Amino acid sequence: MEGYGEAVFATEYLCKEYRHTVALRDVSITIPRGQIYGLIGENGAGKTTLLRILCGLTLPTRGRLLLFGAADAARQSEMRRRMGCLVDGPALYADLTAWQNLKVQCLQRGLNEADIAPTLQLVGLKDTGSKPAGKFSLGMRQRLGLAVALLGKPEFLVLDEPLNGLDPMGIQELRHLLEKLNREQGMTILLSSHILSELHQLATCYGILHNGQLLEQLTAEELDARCSKYLLVRTDNDRRAVDILRKMFPEAICQATVEGLRLFPVGNEAAATASGVLMENGLHVQELAVRSEGLEAYFTALVGGDSHADAG
């Protein structure tokens, strides 16, 4: 996650507690400008809580956050004018049409009504006519919520589970739209989703939340490397094995997971080399194999198999 320059949003040791429940615990996260950041986590991991804090819908219990470099609350409130947010589901007027819903938003936020028609066309709702939002399908309501978030051409778009309710074609269209906004307008996008296969096709960097803690931040390239071939090693002394493997493969990453040690990226020849050296150092090798996996399997291994995320 190094080398991306300015962050549009960053936190340091951010915590959120609700009476006896800890929703976020010491989360230090960085959202780089110009990236599509995928926030991964099972239900209850803290994704929505983090996004609600970012959008000013709730306050952290403690910790520090920066929004476009602003640290104080007054400046952050001003900076949120540069954001578009879809969190907690779209807040819509059921008896108003799509166009009327956006007009209300324009009046409330001091935006130009001339943006309404192109925004509706952008999300595929330009032909809904006089149909009230209350009669929209779940997918159409998600699209209208996205249109609300896109009004004013925000620099930073925050979306909580935007794929909910969309059919496969709708998911593909949304993915292409977000890629276009990022590519052509330089829009920074933060989105959470449990449909990991879609995130894997869209995001340029990732954060993995589990039980309120940020386990890892990594780029798409780093994730692809870890989701390709890796060497799985289990010994009678994994702590010592880590030291030996890091000396053998100084350019590789060695990671402890519930299934054993993972070394990546590696080639097929690494298994034979590692086995011999580990045994020469007096370790009992219980398992050593070259494997490969996808994002869901990587995520499950990282959080210990206690995942409700979906491969899509």
Where does each model-flagged region fall?
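ABC transporter nucleotide-binding domains
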Residues: A7-F9, K16-L191, L196-H210, L214-E216
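Glycine-centered loop/turn motif at secondary-structure junctions
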Residues: G110, G124, M248-F249, G282
